[in-house]
Regions:
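Short helix/turn-capping signatures at newly exposed starts of structured segments
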Residues: 1-106, 110-129
Length: 129
């Protein structure tokens, strides 16, 4: 994984990076007739860099728009979900990424959405021509 370049290796078969397409996703074992319009949740938590994550992919116009990672190494009660955001901040720090970093290819954010009570690491890919 080279997060500073937007490259996230889910496993040997699924490597998400700038300009990753839905057509490429369809060639992986994770494709189960999803339409590429709605959010795609991978069925099982995935181990990335020795941590367990719930992984979601968002495509826009056939290209990756966002990869969302929710670390599920630890269980949090509904009222403590915001503490998961602290864990995500720590993970990004361990990877050498400053909070809410912008890159040429996109940006990485650790967010806590109070309205939906969800914490996640969002890797947003800018559309390229």
């Amino acid at each position: 994984m080279d997060i500073s370049k937007g490259i996230v290796e889910i496993d040997n078969e699924l490597v998400v990076k700038p300009n990753f397409t839905f057509e490429q996703f369809k060639e992986t074992k994770y494709y189960t007739n999803q339409d590429g319009i709605r959010i795609i949740y991978l069925d099982e938590p995935q181990i990335i860099k020795n941590r367990k994550y719930i992984v979601s992919l968002f495509f826009r116009d056939g290209k990756i728009y966002m990869l969302s990672l929710i670390c599920c190494d630890e269980e949090y009660s509904e009222k403590d979900e915001s503490k998961r955001n602290d864990l995500h901040d720590l993970i990004l720090k361990e990877l050498g990424v400053l909070e809410n970093s912008n890159f040429e290819w996109g940006e990485i954010k650790s967010i806590y959405d109070a309205r939906s009570n969800i914490s996640s690491i969002n890797i947003i890919y800018y559309a390229s021509t």
